[in-house]
């Protein structure tokens, strides 16, 4: 994936799309670290496990349930991988500075497309998960292993909490995507 340097409020900030899924995202992060990157704010969208979370609502990930394989190559087995507290604090401070409502969230990281079954959604909700995505646990694990600062900001996208999937038009929410990108840049500058 191409990497870009973006001028954000007079400061150069790196930008790269890590792809979809834990293995590829981890590889992109490894390459960025090899190039000297030490502070990362990841941003994007994720599915919600509770339809009461409005599309576009922001979620600061504090940790992720490890239901993928990549993270286990970086950290000993455990149920969760955590975001770096400094990155979480930078994200929360950024959002609060703008008066933007948000939730501190646990994500469910899966590597299986189309397998957010009702039973799995119930299980993950019982574990405290508010959203599902495909990279966070692996990225948190790589960051811990490589001793860098990494956090993640998501906007609430599709809803997988019911018997039928509800896209909620999340792929067309360009304003939400632009918002999380700008907020991620700002939070990164706080690190």
What are these regions (language model features)?
Residues 38-39, 130, 149:
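Short acidic/polar active-site loop segments enriched in Thr and Asp
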Residues 78-126:
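Active-site rim beta-loop-alpha module in soluble metabolic enzymes
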Residues 137-172:
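Zn-dependent metallopeptidase/amidohydrolase metal-coordination segment
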